[in-house]
Amino acid sequence: MAVAETSLVKKNHQITTIVKQKIAQKLIEKVPMTAIAECLAVSTSTVIRTLKEFKFKIDINFLPEHMSWDEYSFKKGKMSFIVQDFDSRNILAILDRRTQVTIRNHFLRYPRQVRSRVKVITMDMFSPYYEIAKKLFPKDKIVLDRFHIVQYISRAMSRIRIQIMNQLDWKSHEYKGSKRYWKLIQQDSRKLSDKHFYLPTFRMYLTNKEVLEKLLSYSQELREHYELYQLFHFQDKQADHFFSLIEDTISCVNTIFQTVFKTLIKDKDKIINALELPYSNAKLEATNNLIKVIKRNTFGFRNFNNF
């Protein structure tokens, strides 16, 4: 039996080439596959089959000089690994796991000569990345993301605040104030507002600076650690000042700060790189935010390959 043929539809196919092209265009938008299917009057299976016709090909003969590593939550309890070209923002790879074995097996596909071209890798403070990066890329410099360093210190300050707050009577104004206005302690003191607000907890109009002063007056230990915490800022990016401050105070601070300081000293070379080099994970974090938007629009992905 003869089969009619036309340039509009491939042989033995029922979906026109134009429709498939339109599906491909919409697949790069932040739209669920079910919405694409409904818009073009095709089945969701057709959209999925069209998606699978595209393959993410890896060029094993190229790696950029500057890379960014990070992870994101693919689904509850499962972290995936993402690599991005720092300069072009092109995604180089998305791996379903962030284990050392998975990362090593992926990058060992690249010849050593290609891997030797990599000069800088930015990453967060996930220590398993350090070892694997040094083994795979012998000439690279590891640059810790400055935001994660600040966040690490900030979380320690928050734990100290909670520890001191829990020593107060939970019915007292001191406890309620410390719990309600905790963000003022975490905030950069130079950015506190001078505007007056009526605060029910204190039953008066106060500025943020005045509220902060009240909170610090409840505990001398809290005040001392807050003042130290405020000295750790990267606006001036002075590595010598940063580490001399740690060395001068490590023996007389709360054990929570001591643990943090020891980690920072251990990662001193990577933190110095973060302060001296113009690289960070900011661009990759923007990509991760886009991934979160896609996941939210599609209510998640069950199949990693489809993602």
Please place each PLM-identified region on the residue numbering:
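RNase H-like nuclease fold core
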Residues: T46-V120, M125-I132
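Acidic/histidine-rich catalytic cores and adjacent linkers
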Residues: L51, K76-G77, F81, L95-D96, ...
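Short, surface-exposed amphipathic charged segments that create phosphate/polyanion-binding patches used
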Residues: R155-N166
